[in-house]
Protein backbone atom coordinates (compact mmCIF):
# COMPACT_ATOMS: atom_id res chain seq x y z
CA UNK A 1 0.00 0.00 0.00
CA UNK A 2 1.34 3.45 -0.88
CA UNK A 3 2.00 5.97 1.86
CA UNK A 4 -0.59 8.44 0.57
CA UNK A 5 -3.25 5.71 0.44
CA UNK A 6 -2.39 4.61 3.98
CA UNK A 7 -2.66 8.20 5.21
CA UNK A 8 -6.06 8.48 3.54
CA UNK A 9 -7.26 5.32 5.29
CA UNK A 10 -5.99 6.75 8.59
CA UNK A 11 -8.12 9.85 8.07
CA UNK A 12 -5.53 12.28 6.73
CA UNK A 13 -6.03 14.41 3.63
CA UNK A 14 -2.74 15.81 2.34
CA UNK A 15 -2.61 19.39 1.11
CA UNK A 16 0.09 21.71 -0.22
CA UNK A 17 3.79 21.50 0.57
CA UNK A 18 4.82 24.21 3.06
CA UNK A 19 8.49 23.30 3.47
CA UNK A 20 11.10 21.21 1.72
CA UNK A 21 14.54 19.86 2.58
CA UNK A 22 17.06 17.58 0.88
CA UNK A 23 15.37 14.34 1.97
CA UNK A 24 12.03 15.50 3.32
CA UNK A 25 9.10 17.80 2.79
CA UNK A 26 6.42 19.17 5.10
CA UNK A 27 2.81 19.15 3.97
CA UNK A 28 -0.27 20.63 5.54
CA UNK A 29 -3.07 18.10 6.07
CA UNK A 30 -6.48 17.74 7.62
CA UNK A 31 -7.06 15.01 10.17
CA UNK A 32 -10.31 13.34 11.17
CA UNK A 33 -8.60 11.82 14.20
CA UNK A 34 -7.28 15.13 15.54
CA UNK A 35 -10.23 17.14 14.21
CA UNK A 36 -8.35 19.86 12.40
CA UNK A 37 -5.23 20.90 10.56
CA UNK A 38 -1.90 19.18 11.15
CA UNK A 39 1.53 19.27 9.52
CA UNK A 40 3.04 16.05 8.18
CA UNK A 41 6.78 15.76 7.62
CA UNK A 42 7.49 13.18 4.92
CA UNK A 43 10.99 11.69 5.11
CA UNK A 44 12.22 9.58 2.19
CA UNK A 45 14.90 7.36 3.64
CA UNK A 46 15.68 5.79 0.26
CA UNK A 47 16.97 9.11 -1.10
CA UNK A 48 18.98 9.99 1.99
CA UNK A 49 22.67 9.13 2.58
CA UNK A 50 23.61 6.58 5.27
CA UNK A 51 24.89 9.31 7.62
CA UNK A 52 21.44 10.89 7.68
CA UNK A 53 19.53 7.61 8.00
CA UNK A 54 21.79 6.07 10.64
CA UNK A 55 22.76 9.12 12.72
CA UNK A 56 20.77 12.32 12.28
CA UNK A 57 17.29 10.87 11.70
CA UNK A 58 17.37 8.53 14.75
CA UNK A 59 18.50 11.45 16.92
CA UNK A 60 15.65 13.63 15.66
CA UNK A 61 13.07 10.90 16.25
CA UNK A 62 14.40 10.20 19.75
CA UNK A 63 14.12 13.87 20.69
CA UNK A 64 10.64 14.28 19.22
CA UNK A 65 9.39 11.19 21.07
CA UNK A 66 10.74 12.39 24.40
CA UNK A 67 10.17 16.14 24.67
CA UNK A 68 7.07 17.65 26.23
CA UNK A 69 7.05 21.44 26.46
CA UNK A 70 4.42 24.08 25.62
CA UNK A 71 6.86 25.90 23.34
CA UNK A 72 8.22 22.89 21.46
CA UNK A 73 6.21 21.45 18.59
CA UNK A 74 4.11 18.45 19.63
CA UNK A 75 4.20 15.25 17.56
CA UNK A 76 0.97 13.26 17.45
CA UNK A 77 2.24 10.09 15.81
CA UNK A 78 4.89 8.46 13.62
CA UNK A 79 3.81 6.37 10.63
CA UNK A 80 6.39 4.10 8.98
CA UNK A 81 5.74 2.62 5.55
CA UNK A 82 7.54 -0.30 3.93
CA UNK A 83 8.51 1.81 0.90
CA UNK A 84 11.06 3.65 3.02
CA UNK A 85 8.97 6.70 3.80
CA UNK A 86 8.35 7.98 7.31
CA UNK A 87 5.47 10.31 8.15
CA UNK A 88 5.74 12.51 11.25
CA UNK A 89 2.37 14.01 12.18
CA UNK A 90 2.68 17.17 14.26
CA UNK A 91 1.07 20.44 15.20
CA UNK A 92 0.48 22.87 12.36
CA UNK A 93 1.47 26.52 12.65
CA UNK A 94 0.02 29.62 11.04
CA UNK A 95 3.42 31.10 10.20
CA UNK A 96 7.00 31.33 11.43
CA UNK A 97 9.13 34.10 12.87
CA UNK A 98 10.98 34.81 9.63
CA UNK A 99 7.75 35.21 7.68
CA UNK A 100 6.36 37.49 10.39
CA UNK A 101 9.42 39.76 10.31
CA UNK A 102 9.46 39.82 6.50
CA UNK A 103 5.77 40.71 6.48
CA UNK A 104 5.60 43.19 9.37
CA UNK A 105 9.15 44.37 9.96
CA UNK A 106 10.72 44.45 13.42
CA UNK A 107 8.65 43.12 16.31
CA UNK A 108 7.66 45.73 18.94
CA UNK A 109 9.58 45.57 22.22
CA UNK A 110 6.98 44.06 24.55
CA UNK A 111 5.87 41.44 22.01
CA UNK A 112 9.50 40.61 21.18
CA UNK A 113 10.28 40.23 24.87
CA UNK A 114 7.34 37.89 25.43
CA UNK A 115 8.15 35.75 22.38
CA UNK A 116 11.83 35.55 23.26
CA UNK A 117 10.99 34.54 26.82
CA UNK A 118 9.12 31.55 25.37
CA UNK A 119 12.08 30.67 23.13
CA UNK A 120 14.46 30.93 26.08
CA UNK A 121 12.20 28.71 28.18
CA UNK A 122 12.12 26.04 25.47
CA UNK A 123 15.91 26.08 25.03
CA UNK A 124 16.43 25.93 28.80
CA UNK A 125 14.14 22.88 28.90
CA UNK A 126 16.18 21.17 26.18
CA UNK A 127 19.51 21.94 27.84
CA UNK A 128 18.23 20.85 31.26
CA UNK A 129 17.36 17.52 29.62
CA UNK A 130 20.83 17.28 28.03
CA UNK A 131 19.51 18.01 24.54
CA UNK A 132 20.62 20.62 22.02
CA UNK A 133 18.96 21.96 18.87
CA UNK A 134 21.95 23.21 16.81
CA UNK A 135 19.75 24.84 14.16
CA UNK A 136 17.96 27.64 15.96
CA UNK A 137 16.86 30.24 13.43
CA UNK A 138 13.79 32.33 12.73
CA UNK A 139 12.42 29.76 10.24
CA UNK A 140 12.41 27.16 13.02
CA UNK A 141 10.37 29.29 15.42
CA UNK A 142 6.71 28.66 14.58
CA UNK A 143 4.04 31.20 15.52
CA UNK A 144 0.37 30.94 16.47
CA UNK A 145 -2.23 32.81 14.35
CA UNK A 146 -2.13 35.82 16.71
CA UNK A 147 1.71 35.73 16.64
CA UNK A 148 1.82 35.64 20.44
CA UNK A 149 2.94 32.03 21.05
CA UNK A 150 5.97 30.19 19.73
CA UNK A 151 6.90 26.56 19.10
CA UNK A 152 10.43 25.41 18.31
CA UNK A 153 10.59 22.92 15.46
CA UNK A 154 13.01 20.99 13.20
CA UNK A 155 15.32 18.88 15.33
CA UNK A 156 17.20 17.48 12.35
CA UNK A 157 20.53 18.54 13.89
CA UNK A 158 19.47 17.87 17.49
CA UNK A 159 21.42 15.51 19.71
CA UNK A 160 22.15 14.62 23.31
CA UNK A 161 24.78 16.79 24.96
CA UNK A 162 26.12 16.58 28.49
CA UNK A 163 28.32 19.68 28.38
CA UNK A 164 32.09 19.99 28.46
CA UNK A 165 33.99 17.90 27.50
CA UNK A 166 31.13 16.53 25.36
CA UNK A 167 31.99 18.68 22.34
CA UNK A 168 30.53 18.59 18.82
CA UNK A 169 32.50 18.67 15.59
CA UNK A 170 29.69 18.58 13.01
CA UNK A 171 28.99 21.81 11.12
CA UNK A 172 25.27 22.34 11.70
CA UNK A 173 22.72 24.97 10.85
CA UNK A 174 22.87 28.11 8.71
CA UNK A 175 25.94 30.33 8.43
CA UNK A 176 23.96 33.45 9.35
CA UNK A 177 23.10 31.90 12.74
CA UNK A 178 26.36 29.98 13.26
CA UNK A 179 28.71 30.90 16.09
CA UNK A 180 32.36 31.81 15.44
CA UNK A 181 33.73 28.51 16.73
CA UNK A 182 31.42 26.55 14.42
CA UNK A 183 32.43 28.65 11.41
CA UNK A 184 36.11 28.22 12.31
CA UNK A 185 35.76 24.43 12.50
CA UNK A 186 36.76 24.26 16.17
CA UNK A 187 35.20 21.50 18.36
CA UNK A 188 32.41 23.32 20.15
CA UNK A 189 30.04 23.18 23.10
CA UNK A 190 26.65 22.78 21.36
CA UNK A 191 24.79 24.45 24.23
CA UNK A 192 26.86 27.61 23.77
CA UNK A 193 26.18 27.36 20.04
CA UNK A 194 22.43 27.39 20.77
CA UNK A 195 22.90 30.47 22.95
CA UNK A 196 24.71 32.32 20.14
CA UNK A 197 21.91 31.44 17.71
CA UNK A 198 19.38 32.77 20.23
CA UNK A 199 21.25 36.08 20.09
CA UNK A 200 20.92 36.22 16.31
CA UNK A 201 17.21 35.40 16.54
CA UNK A 202 16.65 38.13 19.14
CA UNK A 203 18.55 40.70 17.07
CA UNK A 204 16.42 39.89 14.01
CA UNK A 205 13.24 40.17 16.09
CA UNK A 206 13.98 43.63 17.47
CA UNK A 207 15.68 45.16 14.40
CA UNK A 208 14.12 43.40 11.42
CA UNK A 209 17.55 42.64 9.92
CA UNK A 210 20.48 40.25 10.36
CA UNK A 211 23.29 41.22 12.77
CA UNK A 212 26.11 40.16 10.43
CA UNK A 213 26.59 40.12 6.66
CA UNK A 214 27.05 36.46 5.75
CA UNK A 215 27.76 36.97 2.03
CA UNK A 216 31.46 36.24 2.72
CA UNK A 217 31.45 33.29 5.13
CA UNK A 218 35.25 33.19 5.41
CA UNK A 219 35.24 36.74 6.77
CA UNK A 220 32.19 36.28 9.00
CA UNK A 221 34.07 35.41 12.24
CA UNK A 222 36.09 38.61 11.89
CA UNK A 223 32.88 40.66 11.66
CA UNK A 224 31.39 38.73 14.58
CA UNK A 225 34.40 39.60 16.73
CA UNK A 226 33.80 43.32 16.16
CA UNK A 227 30.29 43.01 17.61
CA UNK A 228 26.90 44.20 16.40
CA UNK A 229 25.75 47.60 15.22
CA UNK A 230 22.15 48.82 15.29
CA UNK A 231 20.17 50.65 12.61
CA UNK A 232 20.30 54.41 13.06
CA UNK A 233 17.31 55.80 14.93
CA UNK A 234 16.24 52.43 16.36
CA UNK A 235 14.64 52.74 19.78
CA UNK A 236 15.68 49.79 21.91
CA UNK A 237 16.14 49.47 25.66
CA UNK A 238 19.66 49.20 27.06
CA UNK A 239 18.64 45.98 28.82
CA UNK A 240 17.71 44.39 25.52
CA UNK A 241 20.97 45.53 23.91
CA UNK A 242 22.90 44.20 26.90
CA UNK A 243 21.26 40.78 26.56
CA UNK A 244 22.08 40.64 22.84
CA UNK A 245 25.69 41.54 23.64
CA UNK A 246 25.86 38.71 26.20
CA UNK A 247 24.42 36.17 23.79
CA UNK A 248 26.76 37.22 20.96
CA UNK A 249 29.99 37.05 22.94
CA UNK A 250 32.77 35.86 20.62
CA UNK A 251 34.17 33.56 23.31
CA UNK A 252 31.78 30.67 24.09
CA UNK A 253 32.78 30.63 27.76
CA UNK A 254 31.64 34.26 28.10
CA UNK A 255 28.11 33.47 26.95
CA UNK A 256 25.43 32.79 29.57
CA UNK A 257 23.73 29.43 29.99
CA UNK A 258 20.18 28.99 28.70
CA UNK A 259 18.99 29.07 32.31
CA UNK A 260 20.69 32.42 32.88
CA UNK A 261 19.15 33.76 29.68
CA UNK A 262 15.67 32.70 30.81
CA UNK A 263 16.20 34.63 34.06
CA UNK A 264 17.57 37.78 32.40
CA UNK A 265 16.23 41.06 33.75
CA UNK A 266 14.99 42.21 30.33
CA UNK A 267 12.59 39.28 30.25
CA UNK A 268 10.87 40.39 33.45
CA UNK A 269 7.48 42.00 32.89
CA UNK A 270 7.58 45.77 33.10
CA UNK A 271 10.47 46.50 30.75
CA UNK A 272 8.84 48.01 27.68
CA UNK A 273 11.53 46.70 25.35
Curated annotation (Swiss-Prot):
Any one cellular-component term (Gene Ontology): sperm flagellum
SUPFAM superfamilies registered for this protein in UniProt: Protein kinase-like (PK-like)
GO molecular function ontology, one term from the record: protein serine kinase activity
Localization terms from the record: Cytoplasm, Cytoskeleton, Flagellum axoneme; Nucleus
Enzyme class of the recorded protein, top EC level: transferase
Keyword Lipoprotein: no
Annotated ranges, domain Protein kinase: 12-267
PTM entry text: Autophosphorylated.
Active-site positions on this chain: 135 (proton acceptor)
Record: residues binding ATP: 18-26, 41
Disulfide bonds: none
First-listed, main subcellular location of the protein, grouped into a coarse class: cytoplasm
Domain of life: Eukaryota
Effect of residue 135 to N: Loss of kinase activity. No effect of binding to TSACC
Keyword ATP-binding: yes
Alphabetical UniProt keywords: ATP-binding, Cell projection, Cilium, Cytoplasm, Cytoskeleton, Developmental protein, Differentiation, Flagellum, Kinase, Magnesium, Metal-binding, Nucleotide-binding, Nucleus, Phosphoprotein, Serine/threonine-protein kinase, Spermatogenesis, Transferase, Ubl conjugation
Cofactor dependence: Mg(2+)
Example GO biological process: protein phosphorylation
EC number: 2.7.11.1
Tissue: Highly expressed in testis. Expressed at lower levels in colon, small intestine, ovary, prostate, thymus, spleen and peripheral blood leukocytes.
Similarity remark: Belongs to the protein kinase superfamily. CAMK Ser/Thr protein kinase family.
Subunit relationships: Microtubule inner protein component of sperm flagellar doublet microtubules. Interacts with HSP90; this interaction stabilizes and activates TSSK6. Interacts with the heat shock proteins HSPCB, HSPA8 and HSPA1A. These interactions appear to be required for TSSK6 kinase activity. Interacts with TSACC; this interaction is direct and recruits TSACC to HSP90, which is essential for kinase activity.
Protein name: Testis-specific serine/threonine-protein kinase 6
Organism listed in the record: Homo sapiens (Human)
Gene responsible for this protein: TSSK6
Amino acid sequence: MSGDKLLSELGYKLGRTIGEGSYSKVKVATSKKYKGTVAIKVVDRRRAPPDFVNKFLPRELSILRGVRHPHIVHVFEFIEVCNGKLYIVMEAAATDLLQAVQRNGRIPGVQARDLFAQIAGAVRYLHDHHLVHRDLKCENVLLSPDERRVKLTDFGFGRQAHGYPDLSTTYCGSAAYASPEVLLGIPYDPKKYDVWSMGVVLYVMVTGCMPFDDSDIAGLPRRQKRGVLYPEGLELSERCKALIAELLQFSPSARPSAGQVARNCWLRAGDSG
